[in-house]
Amino acid sequence: MSLDWEYFFSLFTMIAFWKACVTVVLISTLAWGIGLVLGFFVASAKMSSHRWLNIPAKVFVWFFRSVPLLVVLVFVYNLPQLFPSTGAFLGVPFIAGLVSLVVTEAAYMAEIHRSGLLSVAKGQKEAGHALNMSYLGIQRLIVIPQAIRISMPTLINEYVTIIKLSSLVSAISLPELLQTGQRLYAQNFLVLETLLAVAAYYVLIVTVFGSVLQWIERRMDVPSRSPQTLSETACHRLCDESLPMPMRTASHAAGAPPALQLRDIRKSYGEHTVLQGVNLKIKEGEVVSVIGPSGSGKTTLIRTINKLETLNSGEIILFGEDFIKDNENTNPAVLRKGMLRIGMVFQSFNLFPHMTVLQNIMMAPRYHGKPNDLDVNRKQAYFLLDRVGLLAHADKYPHQLSGGQQQRVAIARTLALSPDIILFDEPTSALDPEMVGEVLKVIQDLAKEGMTMIIVTHEMDFALSVSDRVVMMEHGVIQMNAAPSDILDETNKQTAFVRMREFMGVN
């Protein structure tokens, strides 16, 4: 027995098969697209801390991943027998098949999205919070673009799976490829030739549309991009076009309130107390370095200042006005207004990897509409990049920069919102020794310009040289709060000063 090749090749000229191909592509693409969106909402609900959201989402995923698609198809198609009013649309094989594919694929895609969302570093969300972005803004501009890039290979694979699963819709008489083939070989009994042609059509669809999706994946692959350093001529041109930022200057008027005042700040994680009644005043234009052994509460302290950590009790006053109290008493409107006056630079940089250096700096001002003019925003971003010595790298992505360069971009991003106060969380601890100097130079320049800064650091020489005061924390309390000159005065034999000098290694 041999195959009827003439019949086999004739199947590629049949209009019925090409119409069936259109049906397969249409139902698969719609199911993939709708399932993609619905699956994201299910994944978000499943990850929610609210039980009224995560429990129904978990049940939905569990149920539709457990029930075979064929069972769902037959059930949905026959649902009008229970609810006659649904017959107008569920009685149509295409719609019944689409609904069945969507609810089933939404359950699978929810897990794909969940893995993508979990892969986005926590620091990315914290950076968005520090830039005073809302939850939806962080999701839209930071989390979702990164999660989609991470999940794209698996999502492409799921599209291929849907194309193949669409063959099951033949069970409810949808004239897709398999149904068309079955009708043919039922008449001529050329089963192998017909199914071989059906397989070829499926391979063609998967190859064409899989290639399109893989092209999109390559376009979204940030690490594969390698923009070059701008030429010296281009840098001079951009420098001439740049617009200076409207920097705020410190007010030293008599009777002016402190820039920041912490009153009886307390913070615990379960039974472990991290901050035990911290009190601190910082004048406008003052630079305060916070030092201390690991676990002393330094980082936790500055993270409470911009609500990255909540307070158990106590309050924070910003320029004489209420800012943060414990969870029950903080005013959301006051918090949002105050957050715009505080910037933060993180130990691990937390630049947005899917954006260029220029886009990293432009994003927050554009989000807040400060300025509204996109061209002004871009020119101010060029000014900030020139200020930190990175104008030539404007079009590069964070992965192309050294650690020191990334931290300088992070500082420029913080300055883009013209904050009154900047918090630095160990800005040099993640850097190689030779890169530390370039970051410290930028911070020193800010100090000379009168920027109010709180710097958590292990760079003792730097703390003594740039700070107006050095605060030492230990066991969740401030052990010493003194000017560098007092610390270096070896005639002062008080126990606290001796301990501080020993810790700083200046004896």
Write out the residue ranges for each language-model feature.
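Transmembrane alpha-helices and adjacent helix-loop boundaries
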Residues: M1-C235
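C-terminal boundary and immediately downstream tail of ABC-type ATPase nucleotide-binding domains
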Residues: S224-S226, L230-R248, M472-H475, Q479, ...
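Helix-to-loop junction immediately C-terminal to a conserved catalytic motif
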Residues: N306
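Conserved signature/switch motifs of ABC ATPase nucleotide-binding domains
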Residues: K396-H399, L417, E449
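Catalytic Walker B motif of ABC-type/P-loop ATPase nucleotide-binding domains
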Residues: I422-D425
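H-loop/switch region of ABC-family ATPase nucleotide-binding domains
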Residues: T457-H458
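A short, surface-exposed alpha-helical micro-motif characterized by mixed small hydrophobic
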Residues: A463-S465
